[in-house]
Design a protein with these regions (language model features):
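N-terminal secretory signal peptides that target proteins for export/translocation
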Residues: 1-8
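Bacterial N-terminal signal peptides
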Residues: 9-22
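Sec/Tat signal peptide C-region and signal peptidase I cleavage site
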Residues: 23-28
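N-terminal secretory signal peptides
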Residues: 29-85
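C-terminal partner/receptor-binding element of secreted or periplasmic proteins
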Residues: 30, 116-153
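Short, cysteine-centered beta-strand-loop-beta hairpins and adjacent loop/turn segments enriched
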Residues: 81-84, 95-107
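Short, hydrophobic/aromatic-rich segments at coil-to-beta transitions
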Residues: 85-91
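A short, surface-exposed beta-strand/turn
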Residues: 100-125
């Protein structure tokens, strides 16, 4: 009986260490996974496809004006970026449905979740404005200082 009591804490310790050892490689593998430009772009395309309606229209509410925007994806800007080991970034252009000369520049932030990149934030970086001299251009709402958003107005 004494022998069993002495062995029980050791047995429990061994079982706990064994159980931790089974899950540790999975956590380490996820933390160690590196994502590259093609991974960031693939995550972006999957997000856009999931958010777009049957006609490929990406709907977004403008948080400054309250306007419901109907946009068509145009391109992902190069380069996409790794901000830190858990934050990835892509900048895109979307055209207003029915007015392809009016472009919105949308920014997307993503992080790794369950082994893949998922978008956790999106913002309108630049909005279409018209100049008598230059026509339509993208007017910035914010800029970046050391990878942080700084509002311009």
């Amino acid at each position: 009986m004494e022998w069993c009591l002495l062995r029980t804490p050791r047995l429990m310790l061994v079982l706990v260490l064994w159980a931790c050892g089974l899950t540790a490689p999975a956590r380490a593998e996820e933390a160690a996974r590196k994502f590259y430009a093609e991974d960031i772009k693939a995550a972006m395309m999957a997000h856009i496809a999931a958010r777009a309606d049957a006609d490929g229209v990406f709907h977004l509410r403008d948080e400054k004006t309250g306007e419901e925007l109907a946009l068509k994806f145009v391109t992902i800007h190069d380069p996409v970026r790794v901000i830190d080991r858990n934050t990835y970034f892509a900048c895109t252009d979307f055209a207003v449905v029915g007015a392809p000369e009016k472009l919105y520049d949308l920014d997307f932030w993503m992080n790794p979740q369950t082994g893949e990149l998922k978008i956790y934030d999106e913002k309108i970086h630049k909005e279409p404005r018209k100049s008598l001299l230059y026509g339509w251009y993208k007017h910035p709402r914010y800029t970046f200082v050391k990878d942080r958003v700084v509002e311009l107005y």
